[in-house]
A protein has these predicted regions:
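Short glycine-rich, Thr/Ser-proximal phosphate-binding strand/loop in the N-terminal lobe
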Residues: 3, 12-57
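General beta-strand structural signal in soluble alpha/beta enzymes
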Residues: 83, 114-118, 135-140, 146, ...
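Internal helix-turn-beta structural module
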Residues: 290, 294-315, 324-392
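Short beta-strand-loop/turn "lid" adjacent to the catalytic site in phosphate-handling enzymes
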Residues: 71-116, 137, 143-152
Length: 392
């Protein structure tokens, strides 16, 4: 089945056309600077070089329209379309074939992720209008986490407030964490029972997964909560918001921008949110960059402890996403903190585990299997499309 996977961000849109049977990628690309008259469109086919051009992208409809226009020039067929949706709210515990009711629910929960859901909904609507005969499937970042017990997802706020505004922990990166479990289980079999999935990138989260069921995760009502990230602060004292507004005169929007776009690795390093840039400067002795990496590893380790406790133990740890897949030093710093749990990594395997598919990096005799598993959210989305539509 040939599935077009669409991943619409707040100001960007990525896509990939792949065959679910062979995993062959026929075409892929991206639209950048959506909302601008100086957008950038990139497209490549069959693993060839990406061709780019400047295109005005006033909104997400214009972006997906350009993608479909380009794909229509090829001989590739599209059998279904899968859409990554950041927030499914309280409505969805699985992916869903899009109809009018599903669209209404996506828009209903959009205030929980206003920078994403509205753009994603616009892309879906255009695809439904353009190809009414094709199935569209919404794959939610949050649905995997809907198995969390009430004690894990409930906030200690007045119940009437939480009920009225649907305030609770929803989590994110669910499609990636689901892939990590699937691959770890496929490789390790019965040895994989309690998994700590570490999605460490510009956005970062952990998930505690027991027998395929999410028990807890670090992101909360929004993806701002939890770990320190590229530009997000992660968990801080909530009163910090009130304090900055009261004493600093900051508006709500200024504080929101600060915590989402000006914090994390960028704020501590003072140079970049890109871990590669920070690692280079840290190796040269830059104290702020050294602190940024130490904080990133420390905060991930500290929250990992709570994830492990929620499962009453751990037998498998996986690392994925940009930092998790490519930065051996972060993996080592993280795992060294859990030597008391019997975690041991093989330093040579850890250093070499870059870009070669799933790899075990734990040492012989380690009580916990540690792996690097490159995530593939597009694969998961495409197979959800196949699973939900192929027999219809």
């Amino acid at each position: 089945m040939n599935v077009l996977v669409v991943n619409a961000g707040s100001s960007s849109l990525k896509y990939q056309l792949l065959d679910t049977d062979t995993c062959e990628v026929f075409a892929k690309g991206n639209c950048e600077r959506i909302g601008s008259d100086m957008g950038i469109f990139g497209h490549s086919e069959n693993g060839g070089a990406k061709q780019t051009e400047e295109v005005p992208f006033p909104d997400h409809r214009s972006a997906i329209a350009r993608v479909l226009e380009e794909l229509e020039k090829t001989d590739f067929t599209i059998d279904g379309i899968g859409h990554r949706i950041v927030q499914g709210g309280w409505h969805f515990d699985d992916s869903a074939v899009v109809d009018d009711e599903v669209m209404a629910k996506i828009l209903e929960v959009a205030p929980l992720a206003p920078l994403h859901n509205y753009g994603e909904a616009a892309a879906i609507e255009y695809c439904r209008e353009k190809y009414p005969e094709l199935p569209n499937v919404a794959v939610f970042d949050t649905s995997f986490h809907m198995t969390m017990p009430e004690v894990a997802y409930t906030y200690a706020l007045p119940k009437d407030v939480c009920d009225k505004y649907h305030v609770r922990k929803y989590g994110a990166h669910g499609t990636s964490h689901r892939y990590e479990w699937m691959m770890a289980k496929e490789i390790l079999g019965s040895r994989c029972h309690r998994l700590l999935s570490c999605h460490l990138g510009n956005g970062a989260s952990l998930a505690a997964i027991e027998d395929g069921v999410c028990r807890d995760t670090t992101m909360g009502l929004t993806p701002l909560d939890g770990l320190m990230m590229g530009t997000r602060c992660g968990s801080i004292d909530p009163a910090t918001v009130c304090y900055l507004q009261r004493e600093g005169g900051y508006s709500y929007q200024e504080v929101d921008d600060m915590m989402n776009k000006q914090s994390g690795l960028l704020a501590i390093s003072g140079i970049s949110n890109d871990a590669r840039d920070i690692r280079t400067r840290a190796s040269e002795g830059d104290e702020r960059c050294l602190l940024a990496f130490d904080m990133f590893a420390y905060k991930a380790m500290r929250q990992a402890g709570s994830m492990i406790a929620s499962m009453a133990g751990v037998d498998t740890i996986t690392f994925t996403a940009g930092i998790g897949e490519n930065d051996w030093s972060i993996r080592k710093a993280f795992c060294d903190c859990f030597e008391w749990l019997g975690v041991r990594i093989d330093n040579n395997k850890n250093r070499e585990a870059v870009g070669n598919g799933p790899q075990v990096i734990s040492a012989a005799g380690s009580a916990v299997t540690v792996m690097v598993i490159p995530t593939d959210e597009e694969y998961m989305i495409a197979h959800d499309v196949e699973r939900l539509t192929k027999n219809n």
